[in-house]
Regions:
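Mixed-charge (acidic/basic) macromolecular-recognition segments
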Residues: 140-257
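Internal, hydrophobic cores of structured domains that mediate oligomerization or house catalytic pockets
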Residues: 68-195
Length: 332
């Protein structure tokens, strides 16, 4: 949905978007989200072109800036606008990445407050990354990644790439006026300092197949390690094999439900997230995921996430994720 640039900075529009998101998703939009909107409002034609050249386009919840009262198409739920098949309920899309279904979302563990930014490629098997605290950090990383990749071509005197580097510099200058201005590194040096670093083990989260981890305490059937401590390949292979066995998947679901109704929803949450990630269009797995996530979020006091999960379950077979009434055009 095309958004006139000045609407990102319009106080009335911003307030209306915040109210709508709070009413529909239950999420309190963070200050960093509105700094991202300020950044978009500050872009001139050259900087807008540079953003497009990065493959980045505001999307999902950002479409509400065009019309905060926009309604979904008949019979659909607005909470699935921009919600891709494997998006966990904690993920709210705000930016499309242009290639292989790359998209970025605000991440909320409790469905009320934002806890950073997540991203992943919906068209491949990679997991979700949660290495950026804010939307502008995510954009800055893309700028520096592009500069790193263009540097060799520009060094050879390629005029088109030199022009792109100049445009990237102007885009960076606008962004650093809002955030990350203290980070003086650019290109490869920036990536090495802020992007390539392996994050520490997060003992507050439990390992999940989607790569994002689940914020929950309690016991799990496999005694799963904390987020960041597992061998990702071994864990993923084991879980894929388990879930491919219909009897084993059913038994795992039954045990998770038993634990949840006994007061420990940890297994229901992590297994529900795993099944959601690895449903692959299998109706039985989709149903198990929906059932487990519903009970887990209810027991954890996360009703907004329970509602998002239920809405997504109803609409996971949609051929596309553009559900607002005005026609949208986005790459798959």
């Amino acid at each position: 949905m095309a958004v006139e640039t000045e609407r990102y900075g319009d106080p009335e529009v911003r307030e209306a978007v915040a109210r709508r998101v709070g009413a529909e998703w239950g999420l309190e939009l963070p200050d960093s989200f509105f700094r991202f909107a300020d950044f978009l409002a500050a872009l001139g034609p050259v900087e807008q072109r540079a953003l497009r050249d990065l493959g980045l386009a505001p999307y999902g919840v950002m479409d509400l800036f065009a019309d905060p009262s926009a309604l979904p198409r008949e019979g659909l739920d607005i909470r699935v606008h921009g919600r891709y098949y494997r998006d966990p309920p904690e993920f709210l899309t705000f930016l499309h990445g242009g290639t292989d279904g790359l998209h970025f979302g605000l991440w909320s563990d409790d469905g009320r407050l934002c806890d950073g930014v997540a991203s992943y490629y919906t068209n491949d098997g990679d997991g979700i990354e949660r290495c950026h605290r804010t939307p502008l950090e995510a954009v800055r990383a893309r700028i520096e990644g592009a500069e790193r990749d263009l540097a060799d071509y520009a060094a050879d005197g390629d005029e088109a790439e030199l022009a792109r580097l100049t445009d990237l510099g102007r885009l960076r200058a606008v962004l650093t006026g809002f955030e990350t201005g203290e980070r003086t590194e650019t290109g490869l040096a920036y990536s090495e300092a802020y992007v390539y670093r392996r994050p520490p083990v997060d003992t507050a989260r439990i390992t999940t197949m989607d790569g994002a981890g689940a914020l929950v305490t309690g016991a799990t059937v496999l005694d799963r390690p904390p987020h960041g401590a597992a061998d990702v390949h071994r864990f993923g292979t084991f879980m894929e094999d388990l879930l491919d066995d219909a009897d084993a998947a059913r038994a795992a679901r039954d045990e998770a439900l038993r634990r949840a109704v006994s007061g420990d929803p940890a297994e229901a949450l992590v297994l529900g997230r795993d099944l959601h990630r690895a449903s692959y269009g299998r109706a039985e797995h989709e149903a198990y995921a929906s059932e487990l996530l519903a009970v887990a979020y209810r027991e954890l006091g996360r009703p907004a996430l329970a509602e998002v999960a239920a809405a997504h379950h109803r609409h996971r077979a949609l051929p596309d994720v553009d559900v607002l009434r005005r026609a949208l055009s986005r790459p798959a």
